[in-house]
Amino acid sequence: MNDQVIIFDTTLRDGEQALAASLTVKEKLQIAYALERLGVDVIEAGFPISSPGDFESVQTIAKHIKDSRICALSRAVAKDIDAAAEALKVADQFRIHTFISTSTVHVQDKLRRSYDDVVEMAVKAVKHARNYTDDVEFSCEDAGRTPIDNLCRMVEAAINAGAKTINIPDTVGYTVPNEFGGIIKTLFDRVPNIDQAIISVHCHDDLGMSVANSIAAVQAGARQIEGTINGIGERAGNCSLEEIAMIIKTRQELLGVHTGLDHKEIHRTSKLVSQLCHMPIQDNKAIVGANAFSHSSGIHQDGMLKNKNTYEIMTPESIGLKNKALNLTSRSGRAAVKSHMDAMGYKDNEYNLDSLYEDFLKLADRKGQVFDYDLEALMHFANLRDEDDFYKLNYLSVQSGSVMSTTSIKLQCGDEEKCEAAVGNGPVDALYQCIYRLTGYEIALDKFDLTAKGEGEDGLGQADIIANYKGRKYHGTGVSTDIVEASGQALLHVINSIQRADTIAEMKQQKFATV
């Protein structure tokens, strides 16, 4: 049996379902680039039939990602499969992933069909997908609660129809490791054509068993694991791929398998997903939490000083967690900035050097020394901006008193610069009143967070907001050494997204009115 475990990432599809506001195409592409650097074998980029935005995201990622196979999800319905194929056709290598429910409760109460009908639908879907590609994956939704005889029958039929990967999901996170591993073992024992497909698993974390179940499945013969970065996903989330990666690496002698991942990209990828998805990582999260490599007990510290192996089973460096790199200053040129970006593994097409260098100089003038983590924060924020942003903050002045604050701003509104001042309950409230008045948009804020993106008093701060406008949620991000400015950038990020959507809607309305 092959000893490589294929890593299938569904952060951009299953993971995104947990977010309050959907990721933009640009944000999804940033994450896809990071997954490609990490060495993920398959990236499930989205569900094309679900929305025009998802179709565009899959198509864009399929066009730009070269080293990972791009996958799109579809129900066992011809029009879904057609949409997936259309979005994926620009990819160098792609996979169509189709699925249908197999558990008794799903078949009877959701599909309201006989099991014979469901098997027939699955076979037709796989055969239809094979018209577009040889790489077809079929999933038995809620396999963890499917009667084993029915599951064996479905798997055999899907393989006969041409599926090259069979995915066994624990959709509601119901099983425990011995039980789930037993399901996989039974499939290998009872399905006669099982050797013609790779067995995959997709475990949810409702009972906190997703990672353990996935490892049990590998021990029983599964050779693909599906999951997400940081374990994000619906309800309690998905299997954490960074945990899977380091379990397989750390316990390779026991498990006898390996992955093709570049483990030193784990920390950076985790931070990016956390930042763009607006989902903080808990401090005690395995592998990537802030405390993952901390030792506060005196006994532990004494042991670590004598021999790190006493309490450390893996090193921070093994996941790419480094101390400060050589710093840059305002005297550093473009070549120095590019050299640092190259050393961190970023490709030229992942950022605009001129824009990054301009932001770098502003930051260097403010804080003197700029480190690699600062450059990354600047790059990610710059990638969220659009050159055609209608509103841009040109000037900000804040006066804070013991009770109220006054904020004055100059805001670029298209070709015109406008000025406004307001008094508020704190500088951010006053700034937001200025922006609301000048733009005409009044936004309902559902969530407001400030986080540090660097170290020390002069480190970058990131503001993240979830805003509600006309029933739709938007995510805005801002980065600056000044948290008030970062807060303003986050609100303008949202308002520019709304303004852009309103403009497109108005253009479509005018187009149809003239037809």
UniProtKB/Swiss-Prot annotation:
Compartments, record wording: Cytoplasm
GO cellular component, one term: cytosol
All copies of domain Pyruvate carboxyltransferase, residue ranges: 5-267
Span list, region Regulatory domain: 392-515
Database matches in Gene3D superfamilies: 1.10.238.260, 3.30.160.270, Aldolase class I
UniProt KW Amino-acid biosynthesis keyword: yes
The protein's annotated pathway: Amino-acid biosynthesis; L-leucine biosynthesis; L-leucine from 3-methyl-2-oxobutanoate: step 1/4
Co-factor requirement: Mn(2+)
GO molecular function, one term: acetyl-CoA C-acetyltransferase activity
GO biological process: L-leucine biosynthetic process
Coiled-coil portions: none
Keywords: Amino-acid biosynthesis, Branched-chain amino acid biosynthesis, Cytoplasm, Leucine biosynthesis, Manganese, Metal-binding, Transferase
UniProt cross-references to InterPro entries, sorted A to Z: 2-IPM_HCS-like, 2-isopropylmalate_synth_dimer, AIPM/Hcit_synth_CS, Aldolase_TIM, LeuA/HCS_post-cat, LeuA_allosteric_dom_sf, LeuA_bact_synth, PYR_CT
Top class in the EC scheme: transferase
Residue numbers binding Mn(2+): 14, 202, 204, 238
E.C. code: 2.3.3.13
Key word Cytoplasm present: yes
Catalytic activity: 3-methyl-2-oxobutanoate + acetyl-CoA + H2O = (2S)-2-isopropylmalate + CoA + H(+)
Similarity comment: family membership: Belongs to the alpha-IPM synthase/homocitrate synthase family. LeuA type 1 subfamily.
Record's function text: Catalyzes the condensation of the acetyl group of acetyl-CoA with 3-methyl-2-oxobutanoate (2-ketoisovalerate) to form 3-carboxy-3-hydroxy-4-methylpentanoate (2-isopropylmalate).
Subunit architecture: Homodimer.
Protein name: 2-isopropylmalate synthase
Organism, as annotated: Vibrio atlanticus (strain LGP32) (Vibrio splendidus (strain Mel32))
